[in-house]
Amino acid sequence: GGGMLGLFNAAMRPGIELVLDLLHAREACAWADVVITGEGSIDGQTPYGKVPSGIARLAKSQGKPVIAIGGKVTHDPNVTAALNEAGIVATFSIAPGPAALPELLTGTKRNVEATCAAIASLLSVARECSSRPHQ
């Protein structure tokens, strides 16, 4: 890194910034109402440098809420507060219940799909409720 800086007028950038650029995440976030991200474990490290925190920073800068999903989710009030501060408004575990890690890993795709379908249903109901006149 240092040699590139000195020899080629390069600049240091956080890895998440490069990933967001390569994925055109800023453009995708601009048209999204809600951003969903995830990783293996949503925990005390998540707000401080893991990929979901970088995505949350981007979404927060555009006024978009972020939902994070993970194979394991820590429900510590301090972690929840830090996640909220980072822009992550809700977390969901994809694990359907207690199971051995190998079993959970083989069901990852199915569990992500089921969790995202449940989140989509929840968002749909919330939209319906918010558009109804209140009495």
Where are these regions (language model features)?
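N-terminal loops that bind phosphate or other acidic moieties
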Residues: 1-135
